[in-house]
Every structure is written in structure tokens, then in C-alpha cells.
Amino acid sequence: MTLRIVSLNVWGGLLHEPLMRYLVDVDADVLCLQEVGRTPGSQSDWLVYRDHGVELQQRVNLFEELKAALPDHDAFFLPVARGDLFDGDRRIASEFGLATFVRRTYPIIGQAVGFVHGEFSPDGWGAHPRSRNAHCIRLFDYERGYPITIAHMHGLRDVAGKGDTPARRHQAEALVEIIRQVRQEGDRLVVCGDFNVLPDSVTFEILGRLGLVDLVTSRGHDDTRTSHYRKQPRFADYMLVTPDVEVINFDPVAEPEVSDHRALLLDLR
């Protein structure tokens, strides 16, 4: 038996039908999801996010829908902010952040969540670059008889692009500290997410201190985006592992397209 991890920026659930179908059918043991919404009390399916002339449809209660679709998983929602979405001119407060789903056959024996940039914003989305967080979990693998630590992050978005900045260096250092709160000596380690950086980022040097190597670039993949994203460069999402992780299969999934990001699928032992 292998352990399957899928990391995906779900784009606010914009491609809702294929997204839901894929996340059920892929049968992952651990889902690490970025850009997930939750709107307590809302009766709408869709609301609109507005920011400086940009409008995006948001699936209002994607987290709750995923919980219902994945009844065999424990579910965690980890917001970075509460801000306004719109139903016409009506403002509705909504939360936005990470979600993690873990099959219940893998007990969670440790975890930490923390901010890698900024802090929780309760009264609006905040100025760019907006707050970002990370979630780290330690699971026990009954079949193998020892734990594994898994972390994911949504890296900050800078309107100037994906190049390195002092904030991105701090983000990587903060991610390492969150991981160190959870991981024990000897644990296999997987770190993934939409990092919003380029392959030459100092992020990978900093994560390399934990023995991590990126599977996207080291295996010759040059695209983690879908046809819904038309800009260059094509890198945003990464999946890193330590040498004691036996990689059975790794795939930046080209089809089906369920977001403007590709899902990163890892089967490991």
C-alpha cells in the first residue's frame, strides 16, 4: 500500500463540478488545498470577489461541500482573513485560507498552524502582499509502523512578480520553524503547496536545510499551471521530499483541468 498526497490551489472553487469530482475520485489519503472559502450563514452557492477592477466568482462554502463529499476524512480549515464577497451590491463576510483533509486511517499525532507572512486579518483581505499561512501535520502510518510529517503553504502573492524578496525569504524561514514544531527526528517529510516563487528562489535553499528536494524541477517538469492560466512563467506549485521518502509516482496532473493550477499528486512509501 502507498500513501497518496495531493496538493492543489483550488482557485476558489471556480471550476466547481470537475474540481469536486476530481477530489473525490483521486482517492487521496491527504489533500493539501489552498484558496478555500467558508462563509457561515450564507445561503448562496456563489459570490463575487472584487479587487481593483478584478472580479472572480467564489464558491461560497467550498470547505463544507468538501467535508460532505469526503466523509472518511478528518477536515481542517485554516483561514488567513475574513473579508467581503459580493452578491450584487450586498457585502457578505467570508473566510479564506487553507484546508487539509486526512483519511481517518492515518491518525494525527501532532500538528501546528502559523503565519508565514503577516497575521490574521478579521476586518478585510488586507493590503498586498496579503497574509499567508502554513499547516503542518504529523501522521502515524500503521502499515509502515512509523510517522510521517506533511506541511503545506500558500506563498504570498506580490504584484511585482514571483522573484525573491525579503518577505519571501522570511516566509521560507517561518515555514521551516512551523515544520520544526511538529517533525520529530527520523520522520519522513513532505512539503508542498502553491509557493508563488520561481525555481531559483532562495526558498529551496532554506528548505534544503531540512534535507528537502523538489520533485517538480528535479524530475524535469516545467509547468504546474493549466490552460486557464495564460501567463509566463509556468511555475508556482512545488512538492518536496526528504531522501527517506520512497517516491512511487509523482505527477503534476495535466488532465483533468480543475483549476488554473495543476494538482500535484504523490504516491509514496
Spans of model-derived segments:
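Short, flexible loop segments at the rims of nucleotide/cofactor-binding pockets, characterized by
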Residues: 7-12, 126, 166-169
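Active-site beta-strand/loop signature of hydrolases that rely on acidic residues for catalysis
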Residues: 5-9, 22-54, 101, 137, ...
